[in-house]
Amino acid sequence: MQISEESKERLVKVFNIGKTVTHYGWIPLILWLGYTQSNPKPQLMRVINPLA
């Protein structure tokens, strides 16, 4: 089964978008999960800047 050129281009575009979203969203996701799942909740400024 062969994939058409148009389908290949769409797949490449989707993978590139997914790669970009993962690249820029990974650390904010981890920070958000840590902030929402911790008990007691730290002050938001301490999460963003530990020296504050």
Curated annotation (Swiss-Prot):
Molecular function GO labels: ATP hydrolysis activity; structural molecule activity
InterPro entries per record: Tom7 (IPR012621)
Highest rank taxon of the organism: Eukaryota
Pfam families: Tom7
Keywords of this entry: Membrane, Mitochondrion, Mitochondrion outer membrane, Protein transport, Transmembrane, Transmembrane helix, Transport
Membrane-topology descriptor: Single-pass membrane protein
Record topology, Mitochondrial intermembrane segments: 37-52
Record bears the keyword Mitochondrion: yes
Residue spans, topological domain Cytoplasmic: 1-19
GO cellular component labels: endoplasmic reticulum; mitochondrial outer membrane; mitochondrial outer membrane translocase complex
TM stretches of this protein: 20-36
GO biological process, one term: protein insertion into mitochondrial outer membrane
Subcellular location: Mitochondrion outer membrane
Keyword Transmembrane: yes
Oligomeric form and interacting partners: Forms part of the preprotein translocase complex of the outer mitochondrial membrane (TOM complex) which consists of at least 8 different proteins (tom5, tom6, tom7, tom20, tom22, tom37, tom40 and tom70).
UniProt similarity note: Belongs to the Tom7 family.
PANTHER family: MITOCHONDRIAL IMPORT RECEPTOR SUBUNIT TOM7 (PTHR34944:SF2)
UniProt-recorded name of the protein: Mitochondrial import receptor subunit tom7
The species this protein was found in: Schizosaccharomyces pombe (strain 972 / ATCC 24843)
